[in-house]
């Protein structure tokens, strides 16, 4: 019944139930009572119109507040607010958009070219709004992106958004509806120059399945010696520490851990060249007069901290700050089981 929203389904069931009760009611008094019950149920179902907004914003919700888009599927509910922020089952998934600007959080997927000369084959685990996958599939050097997404509801979202709609028809994209960890286990010989995961919040259920030592070890097995992995630690010291346990070389880029078994050294000239050549749907991803200011992100070398996240740091700073943090494993469930 994924073609029918919860709101519409509630109305259909209400009408069917009311007609059935009216039909079996033996007396006029019973029919009046059924009508009264139906009227009360109508008011209740009518309140569903703002149900998701209320669940999302709770005491901050206001009468008439509406999401710009709501998509329901067997995997849950995807909502988009009027600022293009996307929420999956109530948790923030990011903002729809691909344009890079100075101080933008989108520096993270673009940062791959700051540390590697050539990236041709990329794996994305978790497509969500499609913004990062759109960025990566349009990378000037990339020849193929394999993208794994568990919820096909996000495909409906991508189709409806002009910023990312062309992703689904890009010949460089192979889109797979599956669980990312399962897909890796079933394709042991697959190798990628980069594996990218804008991982969900570390405290959400099942998050440890994408942050644990065992999972990152699986990721490492799908990289060549100089391959790189990038995943969101969502400001969890334990998630960052776990990455340091698995990989010999790490950087922290805002709230993302960038890791490899080969040295990672950002290069401004290399990054500048790639950004200058970058196009999505035929348009530059960044204005020419903003490239230098964006590259100045490389001068912000310090440990990223809440309130000061537009930074990056080397492994030594990560070790000093989080070296004593407990690692996340499949057994201890990380932050899911404090």
Regions found by a protein language model. Give the residues of each.
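Charge-rich, low-complexity amphipathic helices
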Residues: 17-22, 158, 167, 217, ...
